[in-house]
Every structure is written in structure tokens, then in C-alpha cells.
């Protein structure tokens, strides 16, 4: 089957923003105006097409990145609607990895919020071009120009308004297009009766001011246009669009649009901007990967090139296991066999699907640049590469943050034990930030994730989708241990008791390293003091010993172990003996190296009415928080703080009661920090069963 849409007419875009900025509503309107759905779905009514999980429809938040296709002006647009809640950051992360462009949605009242900054950083990491949509222009307190200023100041982006609103709040009635110098008024509630009118006198001055800024921004980036501009010639609309497109794709400009998705204003112009300014797969750098010999190679976005595709999401579905993929090069064909180069396993492509709203459309192939889903893959997980087995390549995987909170779960009945393990396996395959382990001491199943809401929703899904009722323990913090000074230590394992003995002996130097480096190992063995085949087992023993620290049994991180000396026995030495010796040496070294306990510290942002600010700051101080900034705007106080996760359990309930239900907060993992001595003593005592 030949390609139906040329590559230059494909757009792979995401819609991302802070929670409640109106992403899902914007997506719904895009689907309505582009003809995919014939009735508008509403988030608050629980009928949004992209919010298809029961919990999403109940809570009015988007949890999983739903992928949907639509068409506009002869272009094929694949859209991913991402969640705005920080507990679901992995969903944003994995969608950024496979997108070519993003619509960043901002609330015209709230402006740049904490999660907006997180999403922006993720887009920066993958160098994804962005356009901004200032939504909710009909809300009381809406201020388009203030939000443009914040995008420049807080996100350090070159925000270039390409539209300005006509009126705001209840008076918001239309939009001026600064590129084509046309004004549009919306005459009906559905947003389908749009009249082109002369630019109203009320916005003439603003129009001229922002048109001049737009022209100067575009001219500055292009010598030929600058020359034309300086000679006093007008730049044409086509020249402005081409200049904005170049700037957006290069990441030097962010075109800013406005509207109200809920009131059906500005969405068609937003779709025009997706086509005008965001890149096709041909206009972004070719995907890079590693060949089997470690060499870096690129794969061009062409159907004729060897196949390379990235699995960016796995989902349990009533019809089977759905694996969402982005095809970067070549063609993925139904019925073919491909290589999962990450796992080195062959997979059969039994069925291929693209999603249009709730409909699954079966297709025979996915071409370069396409997003779609494969049914029935057995071994492929998030971040794996699918490729041609004759031309193997491994694409860069996803950045997966470490979980920061864990709870113990157990089924309410013994009969549910099997169902629980199947449910947990299925959920952990879908979500790389969700980890399952068994506590070796209590034999309890422990689940770990990115926050309380994350785990709450996963437990809820176990009940709804897998019919497993579970008892859930109190949340536990993922503490870590590290060292503060460099020491030398040795580990000697000798066992002589008839028959073949055991002998392993290592001398190591251990030193602290930069935060976030984990465990590093270096061998400085020379002259065969320890045979080469015993060095890897020594390292393995050290690594395994670091899984349980000397203070309270938490993993030891951020240290470097250097193997400097040792000895061996011709007959009695073995890999196992050196593994045990390595383990003994690291435990001895960590014990001497001034070990300390580390705890996860969260970046917390809180918004409360001004009257409650004193209470909130006092409460944060009591929670060992460090206030990093505060500002007041229109009677709303915004507080930024760093607070240990251990002090934040149940905060959602506490802040509601302290602010009469009017306070909101968001938090995300920031860094690990040393636990104060008095708190650490209590944690250590509890871990040893003294408390």
C-alpha cells in the first residue's frame, strides 16, 4: 500500500501544559473542528475522547498520553494529549521523545505555572519546537500580554505574539491575526460562524505595536528580510510565515496565539498555526542510534531507508496488549517479523492500528513519520527499538526518573495472590516509573512510584481493570545512604574446611562522588595481582552490597570504589570467593567512611489567597521546608519551597483545611539531601526495630 500523505504534510504534535490549563479541552475542540468527532466532549462532563480511562473521566485529569490522528488543510496531524500532573511526568517525557512539535497551553489567568516549567524543560531536553496557546481568554483576570511576558521571563523563550485578543474576560469576542493583519469576530457559541471584520479601533494601537515587534523579530533572524525592512519595504504575509517557521523549528522563536477552547474561539487558527509553524518529520534532525559495534548512525525519514521505530508506550487493552510506536525510517508492515534490538529478540507484527478518537482503524503498514500501535508484541517495552534484522540499530531510550515513594500492598484474600502479581506485572510493563519488588525481610510486595496520586490511581486500576482488592500500607520514603569521606578497606574471604577451600582478597579505596552519579567502579590492578577473571565478580559483589547500606539498609549511592590491591590462591580462589570479598570490602569501607542518610527533597509550589500566606509559610517551616521565593499577584500568593518528601504525606488534605479549600499545590522531585541528625537517628532506630 503506497503512502497516502506526503511526509512534508505530516505533523506529529503534543499538547502539553500545567494541570487545568485546558489541554484536553483544546484537543477535543481540535478533533471537533477537524471533523473527527461530531459532538464536542467536555472534561467536566466526563465525555472527553482523549480521557478514556475511568479514573480520568472521574477526576477530570489526563493520566495517560492518548494518541489520536486527524486531518487539517490536507495535512495529517497525529496528536498526543499529555497529563499536566507531576506524578505522571513519565507520560510527558515519553511523548516528547517521539514528537516533532508541541502546543504549549497556558492559562491566561495563571500564566506560567510550576508544571509549565517542567514540561518546557522536557521539551528543551529533546529540542522539540513549540508554539504557545494562551487559553481561557474568557476568564476573569485574563491577561494575554502578561502571560507573553512570563513566557519570556520565566521560560527564557523568545515569545513572539502572532495574534492579539479583541477584548478579554466576558468581553473576549475575537482575534487579530498580526501576520495577515485581519480581525475575526466569533458570532455563535459553536465557533463556526466567524466574521472577518476591519481591525476595531479599540485594539488599533496594540495591533500596530505588536505587528512592529513581530516584523522586527522575523527580520532580525534573516539578513535578506532585514535589508528589505530597513529599506522601508513591507514584509509579505508569506515572508513572515516562512521566517516564523524557520525560527520555530530552530528553537529561536515561540509564536504565541490566544483563544478560549471552552468557548470555541481561536481553535481553527491554532490548527492553521500547527500547519504553518511546526515541522514535518523531514524538517527535524534525522534520528540517531548506535550500531552493534557501538558506532553512531543516523536514519533518514524515508520509506526506502531501513526500518527503525521506537516503542514509547505499552497499554493493556480489552483486545490485547497495545504497543504505541513512532516509525522514524522505513516501513512497518503487518505480518512481518522485526528485530527488537534492545532485547535482541524477534517480534511478529500481527496487527497495526491507528486511533481516531475511540475508533481503532486497522492498517496494513505504518510509514516513516507515522505514529500508531501494534497489537500482540510479546517482549517489547517502553523505550525499546524495533528495526530491520539485517540492519540493526538501537535508538536512544527514554530518560526515566527514579520513584520516590513506596507502599506495601497485599491482596485481601489468598485467592487474589495470582491476580495481584499479574496486575502488577501488567501495570509495570505500561509504566516505567512504577516499580514492583518484594521486601526480603517481611516478604511483602512493595510498589513504588512518583507520588501519592500516582500510586492511588494504580491501586484503583488494580481494582477496576484486574478485579483485585488490595490492602495498602502507609507510604514509605525511598531513603538512600552515602558517604562523606574517602577511606581504604579490605575484604578477605577464606574458608578451609576439608576439600576445596575458598580464597578471595581485595583492597579498595572508596570516595564520595557528585550527587546523582550512583555507584562507580575503577580497577587499578596491575601485574596480575588479581587475575582478570576475578575483577568483574569483585565489582558485582560491591554493587550487590551497595543495595543495602550499613545505617538502615537503604541503597548506597554516589560513591566510587577503586580496586587497588589484593591477592589470590592458585587452587582455592573462585569467582564466588572474590564476589564475597568485594561485598565484605565495600561494607567495611562504607562503615568507616562517615555514612549518612539521604532523603528525597521535593520542589513544592503553592497558590493560596493572600490572607492564608502566613499560615502556609509557618506550616512549611514546621515541615522542615526551605522557602525559596514568594510573590503576590491579584490577591493570590505564590510560594516556592523545598520540602522533604517525608513531611509532605497528606499535604493535599492539610492545605485544603488550612485554606478553606482554596489552596492548590504541586510538587515534583528535586534532589536528595542529607537528613538532619536527630531525624536520621529516629529513622535508623525504626529500621532496626528499636522504635
Curated annotation (Swiss-Prot):
GTP binds at residues 17-24, 81-85, 135-138. Residues 8-282 form the tr-type G domain. SMART domains: EFG_C (SM00838), EFG_IV (SM00889). Pfam families: EFG_C (PF00679), EFG_III (PF14492), EFG_IV (PF03764), GTP_EFTU (PF00009), GTP_EFTU_D2 (PF03144). The keyword Cytoplasm applies. Catalyzes the GTP-dependent ribosomal translocation step during translation elongation. During this step, the ribosome changes from the pre-translocational (PRE) to the post-translocational (POST) state as the newly formed A-site-bound peptidyl-tRNA and P-site-bound deacylated tRNA move to the P and E sites, respectively. Catalyzes the coordinated movement of the two tRNA molecules, the mRNA and conformational changes in the ribosome. HAMAP family: EF_G_EF_2_B. This is Elongation factor G 2. It comes from Synechocystis sp. (strain ATCC 27184 / PCC 6803 / Kazusa). The gene is fusB.
Amino acid at each position: 500500500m503506497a503512502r497516502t500523505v506526503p511526509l512534508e504534510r505530516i505533523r506529529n504534535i503534543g499538547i502539553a501544559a500545567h494541570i487545568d490549563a485546558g489541554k484536553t479541552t483544546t484537543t477535543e475542540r481540535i478533533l471537533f473542528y477537524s471533523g473527527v468527532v461530531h459532538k464536542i466532549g467536555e472534561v467536566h462532563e466526563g465525555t472527553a475522547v482523549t480521557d478514556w480511562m475511568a479514573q480520568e473521566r472521574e477526576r477530570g485529569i489526563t493520566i495517560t498520553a492518548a494518541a489520536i490522528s486527524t486531518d487539517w488543510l490536507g495535512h495529517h496531524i497525529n496528536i498526543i494529549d499529555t497529563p499536566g500532573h507531576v506524578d505522571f511526568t513519565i507520560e510527558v517525557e515519553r511523548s516528547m521523545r517521539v514528537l516533532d512539535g508541541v502546543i504549549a497551553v497556558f492559562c491566561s489567568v495563571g500564566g506560567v505555572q510550576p508544571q509549565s516549567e517542567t514540561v518546557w524543560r522536557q521539551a528543551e531536553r529533546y529540542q522539540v519546537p513549540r508554539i504557545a496557546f494562551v487559553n481561557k481568554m474568557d476568564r476573569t483576570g485574563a491577561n494575554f500580554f502578561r502571560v507573553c511576558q512570563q513566557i519570556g521571563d520565566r521560560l527564557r523563550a523568545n515569545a513572539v505574539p502572532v495574534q492579539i485578543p479583541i477584548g478579554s474576560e466576558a468581553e473576549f469576542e475575537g482575534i487579530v491575526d498580526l501576520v495577515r493583519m485581519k480581525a475575526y469576530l466569533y458570532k455563535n457559541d459553536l465557533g463556526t460562524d466567524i466574521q472577518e471584520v476591519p481591525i476595531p479601533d479599540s485594539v488599533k494601537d496594540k495591533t500596530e505595536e505588536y505587528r512592529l515587534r513581530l516584523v522586527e523579530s522575523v527580520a532580525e533572524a534573516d539578513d535578506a528580510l532585514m535589508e528589505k525592512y530597513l529599506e522601508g519595504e513591507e514584509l509579505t504575509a508569506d515572508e513572515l510565515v516562512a521566517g516564523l517557521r524557520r525560527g520555530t523549528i530552530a528553537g529561536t522563536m515561540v509564536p504565541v496565539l490566544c483563544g478560549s477552547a471552552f468557548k470555541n474561539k481561536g481553535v481553527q487558527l491554532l490548527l492553521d498555526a500547527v500547519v504553518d509553524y511546526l515541522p514535518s518529520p523531514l524538517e527535524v534532525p534525522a534520528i540517531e542510534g548506535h550500531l552493534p559495534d557501538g558506532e553512531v548512525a543516523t536514519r533518514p525519514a524515508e520509506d526506502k531507508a531501513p526500518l527503525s521505530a521506537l516503542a514509547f508506550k505499552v497499554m493493556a487493552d480489552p483486545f490485547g496488549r497495545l504497543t504505541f510506536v513512532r516509525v522514524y525510517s522505513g516501513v512497518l508492515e503487518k505480518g512481518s517479523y522485526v528485530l527488537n534490538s534492545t532485547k535482541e529478540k524477534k517480534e511478529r507484527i500481527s496487527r497495526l492500528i491507528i486511533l481516531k478518537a475511540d475508533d481503532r482503524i486497522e492498517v496494513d503498514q505504518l510509514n516513516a513519520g507515522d505514529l500508531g500501535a501494534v497489537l500482540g508484541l510479546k517482549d517489547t517495552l517502553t523505550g525499546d527499538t524495533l528495526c530491520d534484522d539485517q540492519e540493526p540499530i538501537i535508538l536512544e531510550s527514554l530518560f526515566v526518573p527514579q520513584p520516590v515513594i513506596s507502599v506495601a500492598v497485599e491482596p485481601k484474600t489468598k485467592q487474589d495472590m495470582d491476580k495481584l502479581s499479574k496486575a502488577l506485572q501488567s501495570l509495570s510493563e505500561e509504566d516505567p516509573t512504577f516499580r514492583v519488588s518484594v521486601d526480603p525481610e517481611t516478604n511483602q510486595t512493595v510498589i513504588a512510584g512518583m507520588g501519592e496520586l500516582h500510586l492511588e490511581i494504580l491501586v484503583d486500576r488494580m481494582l477496576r481493570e484486574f478485579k483485585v482488592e488490595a490492602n495498602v500500607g502507609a507510604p514509605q520514603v525511598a531513603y538512600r545512604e552515602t558517604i562523606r569521606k574517602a577511606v581504604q578497606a579490605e575484604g578477605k574471604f577464606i574458608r578451609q574446611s576439608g576439600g576445596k577451600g575458598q580464597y578471595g582478597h581485595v583492597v579498595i579505596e572508596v570516595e564520595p562522588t557528585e550527587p546523582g552519579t550512583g555507584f562507580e567502579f575503577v580497577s587499578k590492578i596491575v601485574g596480575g595481582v588479581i587475575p582478570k577473571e576475578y575483577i568483574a565478580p569483585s565489582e558485582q559483589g560491591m554493587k550487590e552490597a551497595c543495595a543495602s547500606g550499613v545505617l538502615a539498609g537503604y541503597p548506597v549511592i554516589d560513591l566510587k570504589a577503586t580496586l587497588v590491591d589484593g591477592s589470590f590462591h592458585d587452587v582455592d580462589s573462585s569467582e564466588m570467593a572474590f564476589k564475597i570479598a568485594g561485598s565484605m570490602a565495600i561494607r567495611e569501607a562504607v562503615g568507616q567512611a562517615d555514612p549518612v542518610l539521604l532523603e528525597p527533597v521535593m520542589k513544592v509550589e503553592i497558590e493560596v489567597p493572600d490572607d492564608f500566606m502566613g499560615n502556609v509559610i509557618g506550616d512549611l517551616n514546621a515541615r522542615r521546608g526551605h522557602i525559596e521565593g514568594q510573590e503576590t499577584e491579584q490577591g493570590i500568593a505564590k510560594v516556592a519551597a523545598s520540602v522533604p518528601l517525608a513531611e509532605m504525606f497528606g499535604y493535599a488534605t492539610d492545605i485544603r483545611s488550612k485554606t478553606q479549600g482554596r489552596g492548590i499545590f504541586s510538587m515534583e522531585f528535586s534532589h536528595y539531601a542529607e537528613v538532619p541528625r536527630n531525624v536520621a537517628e529516629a529513622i535508623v532506630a525504626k529500621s532496626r526495630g528499636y522504635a
